[in-house]
């Protein structure tokens, strides 16, 4: 049953906590909540949205699934607040478990997406979560069969129903970017011109770097046994674990449930903000000047322009000159005439993680001739003095290894920093194209 007073009381406490701990310039908090919906049987798929408010102002009561399961109604509510001076944005998360709901070409009522829908969605949802503990939502082997890394941290089950398969079509962001181009070609607007963040989804705001500092999620999901981090010998099983719905008794004994054992360490959201304040961070999120990592604290810059090849990485004003002459990640580049776009990609490793191996560009576009979207994988810089193969356009392996027993990785392979200026010599000015940068370690 829905307890209205309890709902308001909990929301009031959340806002009070956000205000108490917000310290501009040092530690930024937002008034925010999770809009949680779930489709009815037999689909039972779901994907949730984190709704973040820009300022200390917040509505008296958040819009919940008790109001509507329709995301368009959520956007209408957000638009109404915005007209009253209260800005917000929503971030869909865990699209990989949505069973194709996130990047479908139809509205909630089944009618085709149109321009009004596209404009409203982009106004309210400029970014999407691409990775978290319940798997990555970048791409899937069925969607990117030519990408040998497409199976990275794949969880094939639905969110909210781990026994059911989640349809990849409509659940992964690289395909979503392509669908957006196809919809724009059909003059229906582009609702999927999105930026990315990564998250943990542990519901405690804590990032886990290794097993020694794992703070878990809920209490019943925290122990190494339940998370599948270590085997579960029968002699160590307690009655509490035996009675937990995360453990099942079979002829072979006890084992950890699939939901927690498949969880990864989670991702991180990186935001290029002018200051550590609500206004600056919210502005960067809205402008999509963000990127995601799968957990490592990689530092990444990605710019595009008409002619960035004459800029010097060693110039003390290098970054400011790029902003003057180009656009940052998440932006549109409008070329003045039949020119080739140039890109600056600059990545630095996390000192506590593995060295960098390559910078890869995913190029996607709509082919008028074939009447379909396509994507190409292009390695633009390799570590260890290697060069991309002229035919495959991919770097050769640098033979770095990772031990499956100890997780130790090669420390004499890879680079602390990779950077390059890359020009797309095959660019067609008549075809709208997107570029996604990936850093491999």
Regions picked out by a protein language model, each given a short descriptive name:
Residues 1-86, 90-104:
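A metal-dependent hydrolase metal-coordination microenvironment
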Residues 3, 7, 15-18, 37-38, ...:
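C-terminal functional module detector
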